Amino acid sequence: MSIIQYTKKEAELLARLMRAEAESEGELGMLMVGNVGVNRVLANCLDFKEIHSIESMVYQHPGGFESTLYSYFYQPVREIDLNLAKRVLKGEKFDPASRALWFYNAAQDDCMAQWWGPVSYTHLTLPT
């Protein structure tokens, strides 16, 4: 059972997004991008009040994922990536992205000593 409704097309979109955003980070990095994407669909706060589907999350502009602007995102979906996407759509969570709405690529920017930690989520309800 999935934690959000999705179509086959949306599962493929999420799989392509996960690959385009984090293939160089390996399977775990891709799964965490998937967590961020699913969390954005579930969240009803901040920049994500109008995001109600995988498709609207993937193509959100402004404030969405940059990889949709590049040709690599538009390559055909691979079965391995689709299987990873289905895992997060079914509710698998991967720390520290289990409740994250954004992620940070430390390889491209100066890395903060800690970029996650205790946060109050009183305004945000996500399934556990």
Model-identified regions with their sequence ranges:
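Cell-wall polysaccharide-cleaving catalytic domain and substrate-binding groove, primarily
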Residues: 1-69, 109
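Conserved small/polar residues in nucleotide/adenosyl-binding loops
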Residues: 122-128
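Short, surface-exposed, charged loop/turn segments at secondary-structure junctions
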Residues: 32-35, 116-121
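Generic helix-packing signal
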Residues: 38-41, 89, 126
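Terminal helix-to-tail segments of small alpha-helical proteins
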Residues: 9, 46-115, 124
